[in-house]
């Protein structure tokens, strides 16, 4: 099954301000019917990067079988980690960056790698807040306001 996932994460007062994430999942079943699922949540103290990662994690966790997933995100942090293979280097170096400093959010990166396992995932960067119809800013702002 092919799934399209649109994700966004945000935090106000970054770091350690309120934040949230939003995810919209789309797939078309065999009869041609479009199915959509929306997920969002807010947190009292977080960072924008943690929320960007959590959006992808929660989206993948919502899938109940192995899928081909295209993730659209405005987070260069998330997209480049895979498309530029930063993550491969981090893992090889024991979760250290090329400058030998520790990678931030290791717990989230490890969880993301774990939930990606049954799926074929590709990441596509989209410009944020540029009128993209599936941009999840609304969800992330609402989720942050709830906290």
Regions found by a protein language model. Give the residues of each.
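Single conserved hydrophobic/aromatic residue that forms the stacking wall/gate
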Residues: 139-147
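Small-residue (primarily alanine) positions within well-ordered alpha-helices
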Residues: 55, 59, 143-144
């Amino acid at each position: 099954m092919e799934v399209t996932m649109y994700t966004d994460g945000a935090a106000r007062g970054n770091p350690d301000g309120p934040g949230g994430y939003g995810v919209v999942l789309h797939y078309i079943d065999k009869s041609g019917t479009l199915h959509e699922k929306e997920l969002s949540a807010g947190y009292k103290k977080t960072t924008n990067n943690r929320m960007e990662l959590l959006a992808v994690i929660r989206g993948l966790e919502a899938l109940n079988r192995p899928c081909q997933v295209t993730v659209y995100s405005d987070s260069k942090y998330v997209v480049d980690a895979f498309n530029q293979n930063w993550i491969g280097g981090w893992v090889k170096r024991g979760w250290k960056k090329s400058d030998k400093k520790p990678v931030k959010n290791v717990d989230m990166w490890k969880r993301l790698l774990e939930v990606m396992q049954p799926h074929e995932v590709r990441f596509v960067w989209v410009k944020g807040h540029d009128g993209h119809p599936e941009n999840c800013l609304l969800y992330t702002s609402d989720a942050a306001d709830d906290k």
